[in-house]
Amino acid sequence: MKSTAISRRYAKALVNLAAPDGQLESTYAQLEQLQQAFACEPRLYKLLASPTLAADKIAGLLEGISNYLQLSTTLRNLLGLLQQRQRLEYFDALVADYRELADVQLGLVRARVCSAAPLDAAVQQAISAQLQKRYGKQAVLELAVEPELLGGVRIEVAGQVLDGTIRSGLRRMAGYLNS
């Protein structure tokens, strides 16, 4: 989901609450857990955002979810606030914004690394070291295997795409031959 001024504001407030206690990563883990719960049961998400359901019923549902997932008091309060202000629709964007803001605080850069086959630990370490050198931050790799790439690696980091795949090389070569 796309970031909005609303989601960014809530994410920033949550980072400001979590940072002093060193809870940035654990708060993100809980947000991700809640996001997965909503993804597994989309009807629940729609039910919570429904204007026709009584507020006390929604509060009860949120309490049950919070207890089941063992959410922190801060996240329980956030959920209640989002529900009360009818802003649950911004939750996915809030999670993405939170991760981005928390990464800045923690000095991290996230990179999505796609390859045709799984990368061994040495290659992962080399990629991580190069990204750390280039961006001056510790790199967190999110690995994905995409067999259609044929070979090589495509890295998406900080709004840039570094494409060293065989597929893109063949595409460039075809472009040269056709022109």
From Swiss-Prot:
Statement: the UniProt record of this protein carries the keyword Transmembrane helix: no
Keywords of the record, alphabetical order, are: ATP synthesis, Cell inner membrane, Cell membrane, CF(1), Hydrogen ion transport, Ion transport, Membrane, Transport
Q: Which InterPro entries match?
A: ATP_synth_OSCP/delta_N_sf, ATPase_OSCP/dsu
Say yes or no: keyword Oxidoreductase present: no
Pfam hit, one: OSCP
Any one Gene Ontology MF annotation carried by this entry is: proton-transporting ATP synthase activity, rotational mechanism
The listed locations are: Cell inner membrane
User: How does this chain sit within the bilayer?
Assistant: Peripheral membrane protein
GO cellular component annotations, sorted alphabetically?
Answer: plasma membrane; proton-transporting ATP synthase complex
PANTHER family, sorted: ATP SYNTHASE DELTA CHAIN (PTHR11910)
Q: What does the annotation say about its assembly with partners?
A: F-type ATPases have 2 components, F(1) - the catalytic core - and F(0) - the membrane proton channel. F(1) has five subunits: alpha(3), beta(3), gamma(1), delta(1), epsilon(1). F(0) has three main subunits: a(1), b(2) and c(10-14). The alpha and beta chains form an alternating ring which encloses part of the gamma chain. F(1) is attached to F(0) by a central stalk formed by the gamma and epsilon chains, while a peripheral stalk is formed by the delta and b chains.
NCBIfam families the record matches: ATP_synt_delta
The UniProt entry's sequence similarity note says: Belongs to the ATPase delta chain family.
Question: What role does this protein play?
Answer: F(1)F(0) ATP synthase produces ATP from ADP in the presence of a proton or sodium gradient. F-type ATPases consist of two structural domains, F(1) containing the extramembraneous catalytic core and F(0) containing the membrane proton channel, linked together by a central stalk and a peripheral stalk. During catalysis, ATP synthesis in the catalytic domain of F(1) is coupled via a rotary mechanism of the central stalk subunits to proton translocation. This protein is part of the stalk that links CF(0) to CF(1). It either transmits conformational changes from CF(0) to CF(1) or is implicated in proton conduction.
Q: What is this protein called?
A: ATP synthase subunit delta 1
Origin species, per record, is: Syntrophotalea carbinolica (strain DSM 2380 / NBRC 103641 / GraBd1) (Pelobacter carbinolicus)
Gene this protein is translated from = atpH1
